[in-house]
């Protein structure tokens, strides 16, 4: 047996002979030619025994004898007789990419882009070409791109996939001699997608060729390229990407690369281009930013140690220290201060005046007149070779092309105010609303619609030679120059979590001079959809739930409600809410139209560097709002431990983000904010004898199950089950009644059945009807929220769910709201996904587990509750208010019993309350001196609420991530707090709670070292073993 033919040799021969010959034909020819590719090509073309394909031969007008498709070119332009297949019916698989000739582009024009010389490669032998001969270029049809599999030798074995590259070959021929050769791959890659979309055409001729052609001879060609004006129409796709499996190739844009091949040089170059980052020309050396500690490069791996089916419960958040190292804490001491607006009723602190100046300057950018004539830094300006001196603009990052001047008005005007919690971001934002109002700026209010409307500059005098007008497009359809404004100009839109809706309104009314800002709360089922009404108010406040409800890709053209207004300014409070770039909330925020955009968040990164991508997309920070670029240059380097990813993030954030912490100092080195001291301590409790017996029995039973998983080597495969065991142990530390309430009750069993029912339903119902089926992850998320007792908002009434039901598509709604939305009483559409739902398919959503025993009648205090009551009794005489945090609303139910029996007046705030009820609770707690205690779920207290009326915080049960606890308790230690703050955390000694502390400390130590993936998995198992020792 001879030497095996390599795939490289097969590929070389196929690049010349095309895809019409099988792999076996090529391999046989290579064996006959002693592995000489040139000789093998000659054998294939010259030997009758090989099955010859139908090569392109001279065809008279009116026939189409080739299997490849031709485009119209010089001598055979669109509609000319020489255009193969242009005016004649052919089989569908051989349909010409030209379509139907000149009439296919009727009403548009062909603009001359430029010409160039290129070196073609001959695929034939003999004298067939001379200088000056006009050429016809043949392009493969897109339907020919399907991968094929050819059998292995003698029909056995796996076979080899047919080479995709053979389908991307562009060949050239003459009318008299037939096929001559092929053009270089880099040219074919650029031309194919553009020709297939009928956006360009090329003309060519032979410039020089050998007198006697041989296989793989070089032929010098002259080509001219024309582009169709339809490519620049408003609704035409201008960005073309070639199909590819790799991230780098997926960012290949044909048009900018075609301009490069044609030798076109921009007369106004982009400020930065993709090549700057690939070639590492950007200033990203260690001296350009703070040194990146090894710990930060391990964050992604440590995060993966905590990912499980329960999502947020065991989620590892980035610590404040790591966050400050990643995004940087700006030295704001050098910032200028801006005087407090006269319409603000409070005096700003110096650091707040600095923030106001910084925000105002960032919004102004360049003045409107200057910005309208300044080219956007991501775009380049080209002058085409057309005699009409046409100017086009290309974006090297996105591949977009336009004839409309892309000014800096389209750049982001805003940023991220990332001051740590408690520094007064709300007041700073209100001062910005007053200092730079939309009505005062209305005369110069130029806000391009990012989704389609373009700003057209009357001149580009600031550009360098040649001096051409951006609006000089002779013969161009006038309709392309019209700017149709279908949106109503409006004021400020503030989007916040439902909990903060009333607080924003109260803060504005409290701090703004009466009459200076009109405020409208856009919330509830009866909210108006009239854009004129929304645009009349200076400030419109709404929630992320309303935003998601009004966002619809199918109906985006209707322009109703929030999306019918072009906002002067949009502020996202708690902006990390949109961190998941694929979520509806994130997409809804990105779709808003505004001139100025702000993100307010003390935690711009919560779990991963990817969290920043959603913020940058919302802010329109180019090119980082494009996932391909973010993933290539930031996300992947970070995940691979390359410090360039983090350094690039710092360079991106430096001009658009301001972050100070409570430890930041002013020019004199003094803290920018002086607050009363905070005394934080841990109270360790001892279980009573009966509690210890109960806990030990539960622990032994749980450990037996865990040891079985260890013995089977399936610890990580059963991670969710193990967390369930730990959950019961943690609840037992609070009170044994909690375990009895959950245990194996019918309600808990119903949740498991509910999950199985949803997941098994994929093969029936919705799927058979071709409807959208909820993903397993989404179903598990819904079930877990029910398991935790989280209520959520009804997407119809936008209030807390009442008598909640679940649809087969896993959406939760109020029963009454859903049934009222149907036209008949038996079935209707799900208002979220529009799937058909019958009344019989509705499932009553189980509520938080309640207790199998009469807890009032059989009440017994746990050790932890006894310790809490002792602390509260010590504070009763002082009249200071306290907040009790717990993860479980069932434990809040239990806490109400001893509080009532000991005559402590209290109110309660958790996820089951409506917006009006929340506001009422917070107002009563702040203003009623007799109410000393607020019961609050940890999640409800972790979002933006100002709780400075209290000076004591008690965390009843530890969270997996201490940062979550910290965010909640710091709601009382912030601006407005005048008393010394007391923070107490309760831990039961000798239990899983105490070991959780040790695990967290161990994680922080591990982050400082470089771990392999195997070490991460091993560490994850070791942590679980620690919890069960």
Curated annotation (Swiss-Prot):
The keyword Ligase does not apply. It is found in: Nucleus. A zinc finger (RING-type) spans 794-834. Its EC number is 3.6.4.-. Its main location: nucleus. Keywords: ATP-binding, Chromatin regulator, DNA damage, DNA recombination, DNA repair, Helicase, Hydrolase, Metal-binding, Nucleotide-binding, Nucleus, Zinc, Zinc-finger. One of its GO terms (cellular component) is nucleus. SUPFAM superfamilies: P-loop containing nucleoside triphosphate hydrolases, RING/U-box. Belongs to the SNF2/RAD54 helicase family. RAD16 subfamily. This is DNA repair protein RAD5A. GO terms for molecular function: ATP binding; helicase activity; hydrolase activity, acting on acid anhydrides, in phosphorus-containing anhydrides; nucleic acid binding; zinc ion binding. ATP binds at residues 419-426. It comes from the Eukaryota. Residues 83-104 are annotated as: Disordered. One of its GO terms (biological process) is chromatin organization. Pfam families: Helicase_C (PF00271), HIRAN (PF08797), SNF2-rel_dom (PF00176), UBA_RAD5A (PF24559), zf-C3HC4_3 (PF13920). A motif (DEAH box) lies at residues 573-576. Functions in error-free postreplication DNA repair or DNA-damage tolerance (DTT) pathway. Required for homologous recombination (HR) induced by DNA double-strand break (DSB) in somatic cells. Required for damage-induced DNA repair, independently of MUS81 and RECQL4A. Plays a role in synthesis-dependent strand annealing (SDSA) but not in single-strand annealing (SSA). Possesses double-stranded DNA-dependent ATPase activity. Is able to regress replication forks with preference for forks with a leading strand gap. InterPro entries: Helicase_ATP-bd (IPR014001), Helicase_C-like (IPR001650), HIRAN (IPR014905), P-loop_NTPase (IPR027417), SNF2-like_sf (IPR038718), SNF2/RAD54-like_C (IPR049730), SNF2_N (IPR000330), SNF2_RAD54_helicase_TF (IPR050628). It comes from Arabidopsis thaliana.
